Amino acid sequence: MRYMIETERSDLFDVSIVIAMRVHIKGNVNEDGLRSAFEEATKAYEILGCRVVLEEDGTAYYENENFEGQKEGNPVTSSNSQKCRNNKIFFEESSWRQILKREEKIRFKIEEGEFLKAFCYEMNEEGCSIIFLMHHLGGDGKSLVYFIESFMKALSGEKLEYSNIRLISAGPLDDKSQRDRLGPLAFVPKSYNKKWNKDERKKSFNYSDMDEAYETYWKEHESTIDEYIIKPEKVNMMLGKCKEWNIGFTAYITTAFLRWLGRKADVGYAVDYRKDGNRCMSNQATGISIKYAYNYNKSFQENAIKVQKLMTKKLEDEQSKEFILPFMASFEPTLVDAINLEHAGSFRSKTSKSLATILGYRKKTKDMSVTNLTKLDIPEEYGEYKLDFFSFIPPVISYGKNIIGISTLGDCTVLTLHRIKKV
């Protein structure tokens, strides 16, 4: 089985694309049990049995050679489970920060089916701490949440159900459809595609180019992560104000950061696009953005209400909410690769440099990007085990600067701020 990579193309050559989640499991665990649970969970998702194929003409696919007609919802058994490719769990005594700082610089071998790694870095009689690292082509933030749920179910002895890939299609991209869906901006991909195909003669890239990009970028950069555990009483206070002001928690947090930033900012938001509420592993997210400067002549409440209005306007407009999907898919796939390589510093061309500048892949990136997973729709307890800590660290994608991740599991609300700095 093959699935064309369309709306996820910008993740392919991005050099900072690892989604991280760290958890603490309360309960008597052992290495063999954790290994077995991880292997069972990887068998439950079709995408984790795939590899990414790059053709010479620049097209890219998820390819599952082990697909034997498994159906959504069927129990995962030894007779119908796919082979676990290169998704592994490791055990070491280290800090999670050291692990993440080391691993985000190492390219996932997606051509060999490596999408997911887990590192158990603490273990004692009371439980263990694990950090899960996933390439964004393995799925979005919710995908990793659902994988962790499956991992915990398997750890407690529960049988898992098989989950197929569900990708967001780019939809029709002919000239008329682009004009209808993109409006006046339809000329942008059309113009740049023409320049790219003329100047670069349909140049395409391969995994060697990807290796060079990682080496070039990470020898001059490193990430910093700030993690804030928000006490339940503080969360309740903020939620009370949100209810009183008729705003969301995301708008409240955004306003707080805008007050700190002190200037007009371009803020991006990841938006869940799972219309049917499925729990598959795949990229099923879109995005919106707003621009706003905190007005110090007005109260925090007034600023927060304005931020919420700007967000709501975009979220209630289906065309605005979906815009980024057909827009990015309208560019030549190899040109999308090229702007990521421009960002990494390993490739230069007049066309890709110009487009990278316009789209914020160079110096003028988004000031802030927020992903709020809200209250996670997974249990805390799994038999004798309990997830009593959960933290979500989104990647600093090529067009981002200050990346904020928010998650709540039970009484545990954690906010992270992920940034990249030059060294």
Language-model features: locations:
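Non-catalytic, low-complexity flexible loops and terminal extensions
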Residues: M1-R9, R85-N87, S94, G138, ...
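Acyl-thioester-dependent acyl-group transfer interface
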Residues: M1-Y61, F67-Q70, K83-L116, G262-V423
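Gly/Ser/Thr-rich phosphate-binding loops and adjoining beta-strand/alpha-helix segments
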Residues: D14-G33, I110-I131, E212-D276, D411-V414
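Structural preference for long, well-ordered alpha-helical segments in enzyme cores
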Residues: N30-A44, I130, L144-A154, M238, ...
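Histidine-centered divalent metal-coordination motifs
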Residues: Y45, H135-H136
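Hydrophobic, well-ordered secondary-structure segments
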Residues: F90-M123, L133, L160-S177
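Hydrophobic/aromatic-lined pockets within catalytic cores
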Residues: G139, M152-K159, K243, F257-G262, ...
